[in-house]
């Protein structure tokens, strides 16, 4: 079986590029897999199955959606909410009507009116402040002959959006831990959070909670790694909380080796976010592989993590107080940190093992390609039978047969 994979790849700065680079060698050991050149719209000749990795970044995935439009296939849906992707493919290309159509397909007349308000700059962009209310995944779901997802959360949202095709839940593979020594970072214990620094990563709530924790545990430290999003005034927030020179260490974007070294230095990893786009966190998977305890927002995939590896913080009016309680527990109980870390490492080895994930992928490939083969066989049999009774292509009878086949998901 020949599989063509449409995906971003390194050196693109994309979590999905890193994901594919990790997974592809294991897939190639099990199947004939070719990565399609970036920007290509068609698979190589002789391809049995096309696999499209789709995420919410228009720069990384716009060309992949264009290829999917030409050749529907198996979609690996890394994010369920695709509003930013659709906005980039429409508004970003001066196709306002395309954006309005997408909003109307999902939200009816109200959706279209909101789309007009966005285009007229009467309200802020919905992909920035209300993306979860309008996921705009409809087109991709309509083109997908099957879905691979990483969580029950995305599975359930796809079904709620009336996707009727096959769905395979395949865990995110664990990254192999490189032999990178830890670096010295002040803080005992040291809490760490990795990724873009912005409001959706609950950084304001985290900073307020840490400021409270540090009053009772002045030796504790917080490591923030990642670029601050435009418009997010981190320095002002730090000064207001008295954290500018007290217990907080900042690093911007770091390369992979530095990332691992900093992650290894942390005693506890925080992975907070709301709203969720339906993503699975690559940094959380790395933390599991390192055997580190997690504190996460109780949303999406993060809610599915076992309670013995992650303390879950509901996104509600008590979020800061709950964060304070979680951080205080982990600051004062090294035995709890050790037990959670051991459970995290066991989970990574058991559920997120790379070979296990690759086997699940290949099984999905075979089932997906097999389904297409069955469809082709049925169509050939119908065509042969029609010819035998004198039904000509293009006739009324042939059109009626094509309509009936389309109703059961066969034919073009």
List the predicted regions and their residue ranges.
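A short, active-site helix/loop in glycosyltransferases that binds the activated sugar's phosphate group
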Residues: 125-166, 174-176
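Short alpha-helical donor nucleotide-sugar binding micro-motif in glycosyltransferases
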Residues: 141, 253-254, 261-266
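Acidic donor-binding loop of glycosyltransferase active sites
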Residues: 145, 263-278, 292-293
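Conserved donor-binding/catalytic core segment of Leloir-type glycosyltransferases
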Residues: 148, 184-201, 207-210
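Glycosyltransferase donor-sugar binding loop
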Residues: 221-235
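Nucleotide-activated donor-binding/catalytic signature segment of Leloir-type glycosyltransferases, i.e.
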Residues: 234-257
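C-terminal amphipathic helix plus adjacent low-complexity
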Residues: 345-346, 350, 354-412
């Amino acid at each position: 079986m020949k599989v063509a994979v449409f995906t971003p790849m390194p050196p693109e700065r994309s979590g999905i590029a890193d994901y594919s680079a990790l997974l592809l060698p294991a897939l190639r050991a099990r199947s004939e897999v070719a990565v399609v050149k970036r920007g290509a719209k068609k698979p190589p000749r002789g391809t049995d199955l096309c696999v499209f990795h789709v995420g919410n970044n228009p720069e990384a995935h716009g060309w992949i959606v264009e290829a999917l439009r030409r050749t529907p296939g198996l979609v690996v849906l890394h994010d369920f909410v695709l509003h930013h992707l659709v906005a980039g493919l429409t508004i970003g290309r001066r196709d306002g009507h395309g954006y309005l159509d997408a909003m109307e397909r999902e939200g009816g007349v109200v959706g279209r009116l909101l789309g007009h308000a966005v285009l007229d700059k009467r309200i802020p962009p919905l992909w920035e402040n209300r993306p979860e209310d309008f996921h705009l995944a409809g087109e991709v779901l309509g083109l997908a002959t099957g879905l691979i997802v990483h969580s029950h959360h995305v599975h359930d949202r796809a079904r709620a959006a009336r996707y009727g095709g096959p769905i395979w839940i395949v865990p995110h593979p664990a990254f192999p831990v490189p032999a990178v020594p830890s670096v010295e970072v002040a803080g005992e214990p040291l809490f760490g959070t990795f990724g873009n620094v912005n409001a959706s990563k609950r950084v304001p709530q985290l900073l307020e909670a840490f400021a409270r924790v540090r009053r009772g545990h002045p030796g504790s430290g917080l490591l923030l790694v990642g670029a601050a999003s435009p418009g997010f005034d981190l320095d002002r927030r730090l000064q207001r909380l008295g954290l500018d020179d007290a217990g907080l260490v900042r690093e911007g974007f770091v390369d992979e080796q530095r990332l691992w070294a900093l992650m290894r230095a942390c005693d506890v990893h925080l992975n907070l976010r709301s709203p969720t786009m339906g993503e699975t966190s690559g940094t959380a998977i790395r933390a599991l592989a390192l055997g580190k305890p997690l504190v996460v927002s109780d949303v999406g995939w993060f809610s599915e993590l076992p309670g013995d590896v992650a303390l879950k913080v509901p996104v509600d009016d008590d979020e800061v107080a709950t964060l304070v309680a979680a951080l205080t527990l982990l600051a004062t109980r090294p035995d709890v940190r050790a037990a959670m870390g051991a459970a995290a490492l066991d989970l990574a080895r058991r559920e997120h093992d790379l070979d296990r994930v690759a086997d699940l992928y290949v099984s999905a490939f075979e089932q997906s390609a097999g389904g297409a083969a069955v469809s082709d066989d049925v169509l050939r049999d119908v065509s042969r039978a029609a010819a035998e009774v004198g039904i000509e292509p293009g006739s009324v009878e042939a059109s009626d047969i094509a309509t009936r086949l389309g109703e059961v998901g066969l034919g073009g």
